[in-house]
Amino acid sequence: SRYRIRLIMKSKRLQGLVTAGRWTLPAAIFICTLCWVLTSALLPELTMTAGEEGGSVLWQSARTLLLPAWAEHLVSFLIYAAIGYFLIELNNRFSIIRMRASVQTAIYFLLVTVCPEMHLLYAGNVAAITFLFSIYFLFKSYQQSQASGYLFYSFLFIGAGSILFPQLTFFSVLWLFEAHRFQSLTFRSFCGALIGWTMPYWMLFGHAFFYDQMELFYHPFKELATFGDIFNLQILQPWELATLGYLLVLFIVSAAHCVVAGFEDKIRTRAYLQFLIDVTLFLFVLIVLQPSQCSNLLPLLMISNSILIGHLFVLTNNKTSNIFFIVATVCLILLFGFNVWTLL
């Protein structure tokens, strides 16, 4: 039949072999681990640029006092591994790519690997985990008449992450808008969301008040109100500009595919994909507004972008998409070489 012929043709293309192959994720893990070790050897003195540490006083103190310098790469690697696992679970639970795919995790690992400076431990790394958990509970609230509990947990993780990375609070506004689109925002669920977001801060307030360290409580709000150099993209490093350009091109193509081919997905899936498009666009805007936080926002940007890119490559099967897949892969390799070269 015609459908069977299309499947055979797709299986012969590189794109089909990679996206449908059972060894894609193990191969990506092996390649990423190897590149991670090689970049650690090539860049043994790699440190964060001044002003890019980000995070709250609590995060900076914990990072300095509790974690030796040699363990940064290992802890960061384990955090990214956890994010990759939860990306698989997120797709399996909500069927965003219409199949039990792990290609989004392979893409996420590769995107992180080609940016050696992201191998360091940023507040954004930990915030990315809470960000992903928050998305999970927000997705579960879709068209739920009793969504208070789901929004409570979703905003609880936003609040917990914002204690370490205050800029995560900005997403609470977008989350409320998306909850309204998911038809799960009522007065009761709004109160649940508000209680969830404030709960980590009540706990922080109790600790700060008891130990007379109120600066710990005030600092996240001060950091949130400090924007730094708005629109000053000149402070971005070459590797950050190159990575953002690469991600922007893939996002535009992936988002266009979601819009054009959205009729092939269920209504619920289209809502999830639109959410991911909104979040990715929001992250790009936030990076433009606060370029000093780029390194902390990139792990979050790669989460939403990797799902959209995976959706594009898994569900397209024509010659044009295969050529684009090959070009994107070659550009990813070149990006890795460029990023390493600029840091030598």
Positions of the model-derived regions?
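Membrane-water interface signatures at transmembrane helix termini and the short loops
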Residues: A256-N317
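Transmembrane-helix motifs of polytopic, lipid-linked glycan transferases
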Residues: L78-F94
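Perimembrane helix-loop-helix junctions
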Residues: F171-I195
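Membrane-interface transmembrane helices that cradle and orient dolichyl/undecaprenyl
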Residues: S134-G149
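Membrane-embedded helix bundles of polyisoprenyl
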Residues: A101-P116, N125-F133, S154
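Membrane-embedded glycan-lipid processing machinery
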Residues: A71, V75, V114-V126, Q293-L297, ...
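Juxtamembrane membrane-water interface segments that cap and precede transmembrane helices
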Residues: E52-L67, Y218-L241, A256-H257
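Membrane-interface alpha helices of multi-pass inner-membrane proteins
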Residues: Y150-P166
